[in-house]
């Protein structure tokens, strides 16, 4: 038996709100990541991070895991921002309403998905999957590398997507 009911279409205003909420959560999570890495001063020191990662003290290991957890959250939120931003752009007519082309490819077509962000997202997905399925083999240097790349390239990427979304919204109103 199939259900004949369909979900009502999502309004542009609801999509705008979802994008705004995602941007807010990204800012908060980036702040959390920056706070988490301060436990490994100076400037997210790999030696200090590795020592905490392998420590017998649970509070030190928790600090190391907090960095990894925030990185996972950033990856998931960036994927959400990409998906929501592209969908909003389609709804507003800023880009073609193409549901078959992956949102990341559509951002690339708009020159909004730089190679370094694409590479980071691949690395972060790999790290996230590895941490969920083979966590006992994950090493601190792998997390350290991805986190440093994220700290360097995600803030300008997130800002560019935010500016893009709010820019075409004003044009479409």
Regions found by a protein language model. Give the residues of each.
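Solvent-exposed interaction patches of small proteins and small membrane subunits
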Residues: 2-173
């Amino acid at each position: 038996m199939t259900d004949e009911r369909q979900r009502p279409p999502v309004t542009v205003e609801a999509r705008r709100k979802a994008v705004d909420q995602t941007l807010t959560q990204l800012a908060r999570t980036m702040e959390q990541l920056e706070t988490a890495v301060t436990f490994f001063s100076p400037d997210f020191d790999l030696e200090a991070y590795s020592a905490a990662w392998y420590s017998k003290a649970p509070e030190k290991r928790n600090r190391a895991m907090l960095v990894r957890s925030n990185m996972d959250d950033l990856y998931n939120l960036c994927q959400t921002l990409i998906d929501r931003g592209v969908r909003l752009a389609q709804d507003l007519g800023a880009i073609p309403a193409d549901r078959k082309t992956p949102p990341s490819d559509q951002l690339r077509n708009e020159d909004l998905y730089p190679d370094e962000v694409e590479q980071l997202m691949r690395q972060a997905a790999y790290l996230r999957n590895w941490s969920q399925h083979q966590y006992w083999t994950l090493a601190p240097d792998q997390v350290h590398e991805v986190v440093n790349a994220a700290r360097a390239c995600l803030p300008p990427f997130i800002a560019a997507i935010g500016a893009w979304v709010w820019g075409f919204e004003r044009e479409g109103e």
